[in-house]
Amino acid sequence: MNAVSQRVLGRDLFPLLRPLHRLANALLAAFALASCGGGVGELVSGVGSGGSGIAEGTITGFGSVLVDDLRYDDSRARLKRQSATGETSVDSLKIGQRVRVVSTQAGIADSVEVLADLLGPVQEAGAAAGGVQWLRVVGQWVRIESSAAAEVAPTVLDDNGDNCGNDCRPIGVGVWVEVHGDWVFDSGKQAHVLRASRVERASPSDQVLISGIAQQRGATVRINSASGTEIKLAGDLATAEANQLIRAWIPAEPAVWASVSASRAIRGSLAASPGSAPAVLGGAVDEVDGDAVVINGTRIAIPKGFAGTRPERGQTIRAEIEKTSEGGWQLKAQPSAPEGSSRGVVKIESEISGSEASRLSAGLKLRGTAIAGVAADKLAAGGCTAVAASAKVKVSITARRGPLPLQADSVSCRAD
C-alpha cells in the first residue's frame, strides 16, 4: 500500500491491515522455505522456524539446518569459518558444531559460520567415569559427556572420522582434535572448561586454535583461570575485556602452554553493534547474578520487572535477546530449553534414492552424519521396506547424540 492509498483510506484503517500484512509475510516465508530445497516435509516435532537477525548455538539436526531446534534454510547460505589467516570457506556442516547464523529473511540463512573453540593435540586423556571423560587439549580442559550423564546433552564423538588416515586409534594423547562446545566454570577444576558438544579427529596443522574466557582486561591475558594459559594478543583483537570469550591461533605447537603469542586473535563473544537486530543465543548458562546471565562470555542483562523464571547455572537454554541502550544485550523474552537439550535428540531429514533407503539396515550417511544400521522393525514401522529402487524418498530420522555412528530411535520414509 503506497502513501497516497494510506491517505485515502485514512490513518485509522491502516493499523487494522498490519496483522494481514504480517500473516502474508509469514506465509510467503513458509512457502519460500518449503520450495527452495532446504527442507523436506513439515517441521518435525518441537522444531520452529528461525527469524531474521543472528542466531548462535549448536547444530541439533538437518533438513534444513537446525540450530538449537530452530530451522534455517541453508541451501543458499555461505558456509565459512575463521582461521589463522582470516575467513575461509567450509564445505559442509556437522551435528554438534557450534555455529552463528546470519539471516536477513525469516528462516533463510545468508551465512553460517562454524565456531570451533580448540584445535590441536590432546595432552591428557582421563578414563571415563560417571558418564564423564576429561581431556586436556592445547592446555585447556574439555568435558566429554556420555548418554549416562543425563543432565546435559551427550557429546558427538567422531573418533575415527574422515581425517584419521592410516592412524585410526581412539582419540587419546597425541591425537589432534577439533572441539566445539560451551565454556562453563567447573568448581572441581576451579577453571572454565569446555563442555563439548562435538569432538572430532583433525589433521595436524602448523597452527593450533586456543580459546577461553579472559580473566582480565589487557593486550596480554590469561584465560579460563587465574593460572591459565597467558596469551599475547595480535591481529583483529589487540585488547580483550575481562570475562570476554576470545579465540586465538598460535604458530606451531609450543613446548608448554603457560605463555603463548598469538598470530591472530578474535572476539568470540557475541558483539552488540549499533545496528544489531534482535538475536538468539543458545548454550549453557555460565553465570547468574541478580541482574544478568552469561553464556559463552556474552553477558545478557535481565530487565527490571522481568517476571519470568530465571535460568540456572549450568542449564542449557535458548535466549531471545535484544540490544540495550547502553550497547549490551538484554533478555527480550523468557528463555526456553530447546527440545531434547537434556536428552541429546538429533533430527535429520534428507532426500535419498530408493536404493539408498534399502541400505538403511546396514547404515549410511545422511547430511554427512554416520547413522548405524536401523533395525528391521523400525524400518517396517516407518514405511522404509517397500520402496522402489528408482523412487525419490524423503527420510526422517530421530537419533541420540553420542559417538558416531548415531543410533536411530525412529525412522520414516515417504516416496514421491
Report each predicted region and the residues it spans.
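Short, flexible, surface-exposed loop segments at domain boundaries
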Residues: 2-3, 31-76, 82-416
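Sec-dependent bacterial lipoprotein signal peptides
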Residues: 1-35
